[in-house]
């Protein structure tokens, strides 16, 4: 089966499930459209990169987001992971680097937004609700952008939502390193759904 068929099935499973929203922080009424507004209670944002291909992988914590450019166009697949939604400057810069519309960044920051998938000319945008297991279960707002050779993920909270996918990349087992960004997108969605539902 093609990756597109598999992705469609994963998304179908998502929307058959009950939808649960995390805590909400929306812009004030009358705010200019497309102007991101984060919650003062949100975790500070931190950028991470995992870049990989059949020959290996590299992980990097970004002190400066411009460091992402060292990986894009060099590695077959680049996964940009922004953890925490509290640093608007970081979120906006990632949006600028990857030509993400500011209205979509507003959806990234709206933790009450319902799950959805939208198809654009150069990318797919998905919002999904994940879950963090600890002393008690916590819902998490996750936004994923699939672009050519790049997947950008915004996570509301620090945690281990994608620990299994990371381990598969590190170990080089299965299909992960031999497939493109569309397979990474599918694997991320699949892990969220398996953990949350």
Feature roles, as predicted:
Residues 1-197:
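Peripheral, non-transmembrane regulatory/ligand-interaction domains of membrane transport proteins
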């Amino acid at each position: 089966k093609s990756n597109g068929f598999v992705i469609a099935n994963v998304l179908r499973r998502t929307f058959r499930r009950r939808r649960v929203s995390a805590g909400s922080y929306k812009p004030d009424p009358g705010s200019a459209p497309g102007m991101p507004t984060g919650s003062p209670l949100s975790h500070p944002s931190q950028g991470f990169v995992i870049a990989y291909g059949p020959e290996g992988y590299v992980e990097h914590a970004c002190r400066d987001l411009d460091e992402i450019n060292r990986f894009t166009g060099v590695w077959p697949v680049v996964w940009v992971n922004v953890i925490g939604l509290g640093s608007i400057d970081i979120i906006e810069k990632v949006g600028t680097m990857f030509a993400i519309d500011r209205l979509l960044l507003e959806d990234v920051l709206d933790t009450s937004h319902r799950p959805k998938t939208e198809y654009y000319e150069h990318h797919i945008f998905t919002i999904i609700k994940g879950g963090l297991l600890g002393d008690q279960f916590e819902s998490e707002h996750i936004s994923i952008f699939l672009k050519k050779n790049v997947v950008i993920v915004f996570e509301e909270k620090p945690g281990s939502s994608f620990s299994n996918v990371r381990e598969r990349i590190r170990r080089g087992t299965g299909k992960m390193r031999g497939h493109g960004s569309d397979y990474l997108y599918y694997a991320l969605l699949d892990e969220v759904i398996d953990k949350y539902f």
